[in-house]
Regions:
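Long, amphipathic alpha-helical stalk/connector segments used for oligomerization, subunit docking
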Residues: 122-187
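Active-site-adjacent bridging/hinge elements
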Residues: 49-60, 82-93, 128-130, 187
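Alpha-helix capping and helix-loop boundary segments enriched in small/acidic/polar residues
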Residues: 8, 48-49, 65-77, 99-108, ...
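Active-site recognition of the HExxH zinc-binding catalytic motif
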Residues: 63-92, 113-114
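Contiguous, non-catalytic segments that form substrate-binding/exosite surfaces or channel walls
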Residues: 1-58
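Post-HExxH zinc-binding segment in Zn-dependent metallohydrolases
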Residues: 90-143
Length: 187
């Protein structure tokens, strides 16, 4: 696999980070600056991003690399975590008041990480030529939202039912949950 050849070690991924940032639009100087503040460490699990807590420390990108190198799954996760580290680094070093470190918030850092992850193939020089790519991405986004919303909608309906039926038995609750789930999911 291409990723295994490119990234046989955590150090190889770390060395390529400025190049990845340039491909994502950062100037060479800015890319080198940001990447110099991120250290890549091996992980037993899938990966994790831990931001530095004070200037002078490095953010840590933990990623799994096997003895055969980084497989695509590990690469995809590492690119996502790299997005977190970039946000954490900018967030720490480019603010004028330390107490604002960590702001905006988790939703913002996740959005940036997913932007990085979405471009993982571009970073490898692999172009997706599927003419349906945008349409499929839209369907994926709609389904992902519906999966989250569907669970929430069901929770709300079950709680409304529970308040309306405070003396319900477990069997009645089960029956109501199944009926409500069908109503929510079969819209």
């Amino acid at each position: 696999a291409k990723t295994q050849k490119l990234y046989p070690t955590p150090a190889a991924f770390e060395k390529d980070m400025p190049n990845m940032l340039r491909k994502l639009g950062w100037s060479p100087e800015r890319a080198s600056y940001i990447a110099s503040k991120i250290q890549v460490d091996p992980a037993r699990g899938s990966g994790h991003a831990a931001g530095a807590q004070m200037k002078g420390d490095k953010a840590r990108l933990r990623t799994r690399i096997t003895d055969k190198g980084m497989n695509y799954k590990g690469y995809n996760i590492a690119v996502h975590e790299f997005g977190h580290n970039v946000e954490q680094t900018i967030d720490l070093y480019d603010i004028d008041y330390y107490m604002l470190q960590g702001v905006p918030n988790t939703a913002f850092t996740e959005a940036l990480a997913f932007l990085f992850q979405k471009r993982d193939l571009d970073l490898l020089g692999i172009k997706e030529n599927n003419p349906d790519k945008e349409h499929l991405a839209s369907l994926d986004a709609i389904w992902s939202c519906y999966e989250i919303m569907g669970v929430s909608l069901l929770d709300m309906q079950v709680w409304k039912w529970l308040y309306a039926n405070p003396d319900a038995t477990p069997a009645q609750l089960k029956e109501a949950v199944i009926r409500l789930a069908k109503e929510v999911w079969n819209l």
